[in-house]
Curated annotation (Swiss-Prot):
<feature type="transmembrane region" description="Helical">
    <location>
        <begin position="226"/>
        <end position="246"/>
    </location>
</feature>
<feature type="transmembrane region" description="Helical">
    <location>
        <begin position="33"/>
        <end position="53"/>
    </location>
</feature>
<dbReference type="InterPro" id="IPR048260">
    <property type="entry name" value="Cytochrome_b_C_euk/bac"/>
</dbReference>
<dbReference type="InterPro" id="IPR027387">
    <property type="entry name" value="Cytb/b6-like_sf"/>
</dbReference>
<feature type="transmembrane region" description="Helical">
    <location>
        <begin position="113"/>
        <end position="133"/>
    </location>
</feature>
<keyword id="KW-1133">Transmembrane helix</keyword>
<keyword id="KW-0249">Electron transport</keyword>
<keyword id="KW-0999">Mitochondrion inner membrane</keyword>
<dbReference type="GO" id="GO:0045275">
    <property type="term" value="C:respiratory chain complex III"/>
</dbReference>
<comment type="subunit">
    <text>The cytochrome bc1 complex contains 3 respiratory subunits (MT-CYB, CYC1 and UQCRFS1), 2 core proteins (UQCRC1 and UQCRC2) and probably 6 low-molecular weight proteins.</text>
</comment>
<keyword id="KW-0813">Transport</keyword>
<dbReference type="InterPro" id="IPR005798">
    <property type="entry name" value="Cyt_b/b6_C"/>
</dbReference>
<feature type="transmembrane region" description="Helical">
    <location>
        <begin position="178"/>
        <end position="198"/>
    </location>
</feature>
<keyword id="KW-0408">Iron</keyword>
<feature type="transmembrane region" description="Helical">
    <location>
        <begin position="77"/>
        <end position="98"/>
    </location>
</feature>
<keyword id="KW-0479">Metal-binding</keyword>
<comment type="function">
    <text>Component of the ubiquinol-cytochrome c reductase complex (complex III or cytochrome b-c1 complex) that is part of the mitochondrial respiratory chain. The b-c1 complex mediates electron transfer from ubiquinol to cytochrome c. Contributes to the generation of a proton gradient across the mitochondrial membrane that is then used for ATP synthesis.</text>
</comment>
Length: 384
């Protein structure tokens, strides 16, 4: 008689996705980040739910309700620190996951990749509206500056901004709707993640060699389930260490000051994980151009599969393309640094050069170098 997990309508789905799933035998720890992102999402939803029980989305009490959570609620300080730093870990795993996809050519699973880019945008939107909720100085001014960018949309820009604000400035209506969005989006992300997984299991995982692995598959459980558990343990260790020892390391000190519409902070900047995109936005003097560059800095990922010119899938055996990949990594780090710097010389020109290089790498240099590598691989013509 067949096992219940193989016959039960619901357990059968779980079995095919997490137990009897055939997986390539040679996938490295770079394939752990998908499950780590799932863990991050679970942590964020769980801690967020407990925070929502005590938080009030009203401009008169929002800031003090966060202080109340940290001071008066049992382990409220821990829940808040885990949630705030959990967001940072979410983005660390996300960037490493995307980097893995770019390095090993996982983007050639087009449906999986495109759903992944949509997931990335959803996570960014969720993090942005979440950052507004404590109603500190950086929350208020960050919301004002970023939502104001929509006024660059031709014809309907101003109406669009006022529609999102729910008035003529960032006010109580804005905070209330941002809280509603922040509560809703994680569940949308969870649903999109299931679709992401569904598309992945249509084709199966890629592997470091970038070749077809059908001849050498092993079951997901116990091999990769235990491997994932090790990843969980290491990430939870890192997250709890950060939340317990230096919880405010990645935050902005300005957000400990209650929001004041009459006083502008000296440097308005988003959380560290948005700085690379913020630097690209600031590097273009034109408002609409900056908004388009900001949007395209993420959407350029959707173009990557179309511009894949190599005969090989990954970068494992392509040293020139590897060099460009690590140039891209360095470029994103430079943009992250520039995004946190004031708008003055020499940071302006560094940001502009780094922004141009960012798009050049994706749209011109990588496809061109891949094409040249193809030429180098061709068998030389034998002279008679």
């Amino acid at each position: 008689m067949a096992s219940l997990r193989k016959t039960h309508p619901i357990l059968k789905i779980v079995n095919d996705a997490l137990i009897d799933l055939p997986a390539p035998s040679n996938i490295s720890f770079w394939w752990n980040y998908g499950s780590l992102l799932f863990l991050c999402l679970i942590i964020q939803i769980a801690t967020g739910l407990f925070l929502a029980m005590h938080y009030t989305s009203d401009i008169t009490t929002a800031f003090s309700s966060v202080a109340h959570i940290c001071r008066d609620v049992n382990y409220g300080w821990l829940i808040r620190n885990m949630h705030a730093n959990g967001a940072s870990f979410f983005f660390i795993c996300l960037y490493l996951h995307i980097g893995r996809g770019l390095y090993y050519g996982s983007y050639l699973n087009k449906e999986t990749w495109n759903v992944g880019v949509i997931l990335f945008l959803l996570v960014m939107m969720t993090a942005f509206v979440g950052y507004v909720l404590p109603w500190g100085q950086m929350s208020f001014w960050g919301a004002t500056v970023i939502t104001n960018l929509l006024s660059a949309v031709p014809y309907v820009g101003n109406a669009l901004v006022q529609w999102i604000w729910g008035g003529f400035s960032v006010d109580n209506a804005t905070l209330t709707r941002f809280f509603a969005f922040h509560f809703l989006f994680p569940f949308v992300i969870a649903a999109a993640a299931v679709i992401h997984l569904l598309f992945l299991h249509e084709t199966g995982s890629n592997n470091p060699a970038g070749v077809n692995s059908n001849a050498d598959k092993i079951s997901f459980h116990p091999y990769f389930s235990y491997k994932d558990l090790l990843g969980f343990a290491l990430m939870l260790l890192a997250l709890t260490s950060l939340a317990l020892f230096t919880p405010n390391l990645l935050g902005d000190p300005d957000n400990f000051i209650p929001a004041n519409p009459l006083v502008t902070p000296p440097h308005i900047k988003p959380e560290w994980y948005f700085l690379f995109a913020y630097a690209i936005l600031r590097s273009i003097p034109n408002k609409l151009g900056g908004v388009l560059a900001l949007l395209f800095s993420i959407l350029v990922l959707m173009v990557v599969p179309i511009l894949h010119t190599s005969v090989q899938r990954g970068l494992t055996f392509r040293p020139l393309s590897q060099m460009l990949f690590w140039t891209l990594v360095a470029d994103v780090l430079i943009l992250t640094w520039i995004g946190g710097m004031p708008v003055e010389h020499p940071f302006i020109i560094i940001g502009q050069v780094a922004s141009v290089l960012y798009f050049m790498l994706f749209l011109v240099l990588m496809p061109l170098v891949s094409w040249l590598e193809n030429k180098a691989l061709r068998k030389p013509i034998e002279l008679a």
